[in-house]
Amino acid sequence: MKKSHAKPFALRAIVVATAAALSLPAAAVTDVTWEDIANDHKTTGDVLTYGLGLKAQRHSPLKAINTDNVANLVPAWSFSFGGEKQRGQEAQVLVHDGVIYATASYSRIFAIDARSGKRLWEYNARLPDDIRPCCDVVNRGAAIYGDKVFFGTLDAAMVALDRKTGKVVWRKKFGDHKVGYTMTGAPFVIKDQKSGRTLLVHGSSGDEFGVVGWLFARDPDTGEEVWARPMVEGHMGRLNGKDSTPTGDPKAPSWPDDPNSPTGKVEAWSQGGGAPWQTASFDVENNMVVIGAGNPAPWNTWKRTAPGDDPRNWDSLFTSGQAYVDASTGELKGFYQHTPNDAWDFSGNNSVVLFEYKDPKTGKMVNASAHADRNGFFFVTDRDMLAKGAGYPNKPTSLIGAWPFVDGITWASGFDLKTGKPIEKDNRPPQPKEGADKGESIFVSPPFLGGTNWHPMSYSPDTGLFYIPANHWAMDYWTENVTYKAGSAYLGQGFRIKNLFDDHVGILRAIDPSPARSLGAQGRVPAVAGTLTTAGGWVFTGTSDGYLKAFDAKNGKELWKFQTGSGVVSVPVTWEMDGEQYVAIQSGYGGAVPLWGGDMAELTKQVTQGGSMWVFKLPKASR
């Protein structure tokens, strides 16, 4: 995923589980149905999904706030998450029946009156002091269905709460937090198109501690596991509580053998990573859960390469790519790998946005996926081919195109559209020489923090453009010796993040998809907040030095900004209530950059911590 060889951020406080303050009146809350969720992309009174729809396009049809009046936005209210529990606030909120559901750092969730900003209830998870989040004590959001709201906790549990009261309905552990399992991403609700069963889908986190990543589907009423899919080739999945099928080839040929190992494979295979720690999208037509798979463990590519061999001969499947999983069985139907045998921690977790792509050669529309990867390339893949097994041996590639969206990429010059493989430059970090503790340092761009990180992009069907919060930066990078030890960081790489250019780091990029073109929106500090588009013609995002900003979606002109008092590393939403359009975003600096960002951490050290949510609307005179 995204941090250094330093010790993980340690928690020392025990947080008491509470459901506090006022509960919601029964008449005020209606159950959320599957039809509500399936229509989230076109309804305007609620925000029911992470991504504003099953396709994760993050586009709203609302247009009361437009390019002519967005400069008049004013705060409607703000809400403090309170206490000393600040750190990074990375969540996207949900909105239903006039109530906002907002998760916050340290595994907390709040129900807030959307009209007044009044707290209705609060739930604080009881966290042990031996949890191991790699990249801050963050939470990125919740899911909502029926009369419940769901979110994950840093001690590797999924929790269901009564939406009216905040009381726990069920809680399920899915991994051992002491060895590194945790959860930071928002869960997602889908409906199996074959059985008609509604499922709660979520992944695990923990690649940096050498744990195998898993994708889970649960019964939202009981929390019971329906299926579970490991993301490392050859590991066994589960269905209805029993072993089902291995992921890919049971012999795991993309990972080297080791005759001296009890498993017959190299150590890394047993600890192989691939955690799907971000939130899924859902391909209804093909009945597939679509999600990014994380980096292999350890980062050290030589630990996943046969002795004396070329790392490019090994893929470390099924890591650092986009996975297509059968909603009925949990079988891996297809896979596209962005970075084979990933040596740079580029991972593959960034959002996978589903859209319809017009083939410029034939004019035909293709059911496609779009993904802006940390490796600096923007990918378009064919979903229908992935539903038929693309990515497996002897199957054609699903890759339609791959375009760079940042400058100065050092690891590859492009992609072969026939094979789907990168055209690598000779830029993998060398092994330590005999007797040395570390290898020779190399210059890498983008760094492991990525050309863009997890912060989700948006897609506007009005402009046909994707809007990516991108960064121009680099790192010095060297290999270190590493052996697995339970509960310890399992990297085998050292690094120092640094500037690529003197005049900027963050940049808002638009891609159509074709060669990326800049919208002209650059910043001195990293761009580490998600984007939102609307039919009003603007793009909304935040900056790590505390601003919320609106840009013209056609030309990138800055139209409005507001200083929140702390860095913005979250994801904006918009909805309509009482005839008015609202915009909301969280403020509170944290995440990977201040912890592991090297020179970039120095660049933002003046940014104060915070923990708040801001809600905006137009004054009456401007409507």
From Swiss-Prot:
Induction: By butane, 1-butanol and 2-butanol. It is an enzyme of class 1 (oxidoreductase). One of its GO terms (cellular component) is outer membrane-bounded periplasmic space. It catalyses: butan-1-ol + a quinone = butanal + a quinol. Ca(2+) 1 binds at residues 40, 43, 46. Keywords: Calcium, Disulfide bond, Metal-binding, Oxidoreductase, Periplasm, PQQ, Signal. The active site is at residue 345. InterPro entries: ADHI, PQQ_b-propeller_rpt, PQQ_MeOH/EtOH_DH, PQQ_rpt_dom, Quinoprotein_ADH-like_sf, Quinoprotein_DH_CS. Disruption phenotype: Cells lacking this gene show a delayed growth on butane and are unable to tolerate high level of 1-butanol. When both bdh and boh genes are inactivated, growth on butane and 1-butanol is eliminated. Pyrroloquinoline quinone binds at residues 90, 140, 184, 202-204, 374, 592. It holds the Pfam family PQQ. Disulfide bonds join 134-135. Binds 1 PQQ group per subunit. PQQ is inserted between disulfide Cys-134-Cys-135 and the plane of Trp-277. Binds 2 calcium ions per subunit. The keyword Membrane does not apply. Its main location: periplasm. It is found in: Periplasm. One of its GO terms (molecular function) is calcium ion binding. Residues 235-274, 420-440 are annotated as: Disordered. Ca(2+) 2 binds at residues 208, 295, 345. Its EC number is 1.1.5.11. Residues 1-28 form the signal peptide. Belongs to the bacterial PQQ dehydrogenase family. Involved in the metabolism of butane. May function primarily in energy generation. Catalyzes the oxidation of 1-butanol to 1-butanal. Also able to use 2-butanol and butyraldehyde, although the affinity is comparatively low. NCBIfam families: PQQ_enz_alc_DH. This is 1-butanol dehydrogenase (quinone).
